[in-house]
Amino acid sequence: MKHYVAVDIGASSGRLILGKLVDEKLQLEEIHRFKNGFTYRDGHERWEIDQLMQEIFIGLEKVKQLGISECVLGIDTWGVDYVLIGASGEKLADPISYRDKRTLNAVQNLTSEYPREYIYKKTGIQFMELNTLYQLYVEERDLLERAEKILLIPDYIGYVLTGVKVAETTNSSTTQMLNLREQLFDKDLLSHLNIDVEKFAPLTDAGTYLGKVKEEWLEKYDIPNCDVVTVATHDTASAVVGTPAEGENWAFLSSGTWSLIGMELSAPINNEAAFKENYTNEWGAYGTYRFLKNIMGLWIVQEIARMDDYKHSFAEMAEEASNYPYFKQIINVNDARFNNPENMVDEIKLYCQETGQTIPETIGELTNCVYGSLALYYALELEKMTEITGKKIEKLYIVGGGSNVAMLNQLTAKLAGIEVFAGPSEATAIGNLVVQMINQGEIESMRAGRKIIRNSFEIGEFSCGDVRFEEIKERFTKVLEFN
């Protein structure tokens, strides 16, 4: 029996999940979990990438302690951030977080030189200041000139483990630098940044064998002999693979620090309507596209908890929130002011004050406000998606950590007026494992993998119901105008 390890690292935590296929069912075991985050060093918010590598080795040593001497391994992480590699293969600096303030106004500055419509037609990717395109636009020229290669985070981890440099396509598409038509890094865009296309590794599809873990790591650490497979390395791409969907008329919501809501399509949509609504066409596994909108997610709730010194668990916060009427206050969760404020609680209160709403005071009121606002935003985006794609959405599959928030799931079902299916919460790691198993011949296809997922995990169901959607939508429109 083959053993598979998913290295799944998000913006706030990481984990190593051991998986195996037994009687057409996936069995998972969490082997190691660790915290992740950025710290302010050398003038920027930076990821502790060396510490992440150490945590991976600690996790693999725990796998070996289970008596497993050989395994298959795949890596997924958050998107857009990168590591600059020098001529000798060394890391030139710790990677800067997408939440760093260096890209403020970068979209405006670059698009004043290079029209938005032109960039969108080429790439089909939504405009966000965190995109790699804008990070490289403001990157230190000296570092860029010294860099032989630019590797996104999961590709860098794979490189450290195996010595092989690739640019996996699902994650590379989030950079806003891939040409949809040519299926390559766009030389024209890169030349505008004075970056040679050769600084990027060869584009590689999800499901491709990468290589074996280097001997030096086997000698330094007591870890299994691992075959590394390049999975869908963008965590959302893996989460969509791990979605237990069936049929055609469905949408997905990968709910975590970010909310990524969209549809899986066979072809991109980069027309005027998609451009106007700032939708993105991220590449998916096995020739698919993730037509989606990137929305703020549970980050806001996480920050409320932090400002409260974690006196309440997230379950307790949701319980407190249920004591208040919904939609008493509505915030635009995608407003840039909520991206990384000094104090999230103060920012929410100030927003409500500025927009003529009552100010939420308690932890329950604040949480109620955020969950209600998120659900409303999801419903509005599903409505827009239907208009742009012409496809009727009958079901929404919510996966990731947010699938455990029953209040948010039920509010979404009611506002959107469709059935909501919630779970599994570890869809990203599951999608990571499924791609590995397809590579190894244990699972036939992504469709077959999704059937196995449905048979392996409990999926929650939330029915739609009557709610004052149009009235609430009108109130939200007025809030936006006020703001």
UniProtKB/Swiss-Prot annotation:
Catalytic residue list: 235 (proton acceptor)
Q: Where on the tree of life does the source sit, at the highest rank?
A: Bacteria
One Gene Ontology cellular component annotation held by this UniProt entry: cytosol
Q: Specify which residues bind ATP according to the UniProt entry for this protein.
A: 11-15, 257, 302, 401
Under the heading SUPFAM superfamilies, the entry gives: Actin-like ATPase domain
Which residues are noted in the entry as substrate-binding? 79, 234-236, 294
Pathway annotation: Carbohydrate degradation; L-rhamnose degradation; glycerone phosphate from L-rhamnose: step 2/3
Task: Give the residues annotated as coiled coil.
Answer: none
Per its record, the protein catalyses: L-rhamnulose + ATP = L-rhamnulose 1-phosphate + ADP + H(+)
EC number per UniProt: 2.7.1.5
GO:BP terms for this protein? glycerol metabolic process; rhamnose catabolic process
Q: Annotated Gene Ontology MF terms?
A: ATP binding; glycerol kinase activity; rhamnulokinase activity
- Keywords, A to Z? ATP-binding, Disulfide bond, Kinase, Magnesium, Nucleotide-binding, Rhamnose metabolism, Transferase
In this UniProt entry, which cysteines form S-S bonds?
A: 352-369
Q: Which cofactor does it need?
A: Mg(2+)
Q: Which family does it belong to?
A: Belongs to the rhamnulokinase family.
Q: Sum up the protein's function in the record's words.
A: Involved in the catabolism of L-rhamnose (6-deoxy-L-mannose). Catalyzes the transfer of the gamma-phosphate group from ATP to the 1-hydroxyl group of L-rhamnulose to yield L-rhamnulose 1-phosphate.
Kindly provide the name given to this protein in its UniProt entry.
Rhamnulokinase
